[in-house]
């Protein structure tokens, strides 16, 4: 059986967040993590996996970027298609499955947080995660509602084939 991982494209922190600010592409970090988790155990695949996970250590703007994120963005620019680029990276890793973005446009996580008797709206995966962790547990402090924006994000056309082959075990 072929594994298909449909992965979020809402990451806005770290290397992915910086890439999102500088280029009009999907955030590659979560997609990279899914790709390396599906790689083969051969020396070739494990070497590529380690290279994909390598964080650059520089005194410049590339500091702490995951090299794999930059490679993925390069493939996207080369092929002008994120799914094709991910398939090529999967071939380099000899992946045991396919990684697909859940949307063909970058998504944003938004939430409504209840603090005491008032609510506030927050936006961004990193902000929502931090807000949830900072809330003092209690009946009046909670993450009241979370949503993804844009609400009607376009799915890549490949999903028709993938959706038809889904089996529940």
Predicted regions and their residues:
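Conserved catalytic alpha/beta core of Sir2/sirtuin-type deacylases, generalized to analogous enzyme cores
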Residues: 2-5, 72-169
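Glycine-rich nucleotide/cofactor/substrate-binding loop typically near the N-terminus or early
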Residues: 7-80, 91-93, 98
């Amino acid at each position: 059986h072929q594994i298909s991982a449909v992965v979020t494209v809402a990451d806005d922190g770290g290397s992915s967040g910086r890439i999102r600010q500088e280029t009009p592409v999907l955030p590659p970090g979560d997609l990279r993590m899914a790709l390396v988790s599906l790689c083969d155990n051969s020396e070739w695949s494990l070497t590529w996996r380690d290279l994909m996970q390598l964080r650059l250590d520089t005194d410049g703007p590339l500091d702490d970027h995951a090299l794999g994120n930059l490679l993925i963005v390069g493939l996207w620019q080369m092929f002008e298609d994120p799914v094709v680029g991910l398939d090529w990276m999967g071939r380099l890793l000899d992946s045991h499955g396919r990684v697909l973005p859940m949307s063909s446009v970058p998504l944003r996580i938004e939430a409504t947080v209840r603090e005491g008797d008032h609510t506030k709206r927050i936006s961004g995966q990193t902000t929502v995660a931090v807000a949830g962790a900072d809330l003092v547990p209690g009946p009046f402090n909670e993450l009241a509602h979370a949503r993804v924006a844009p609400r009607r994000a376009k799915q890549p056309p490949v999903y028709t084939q993938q959706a038809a082959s889904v089996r529940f075990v």
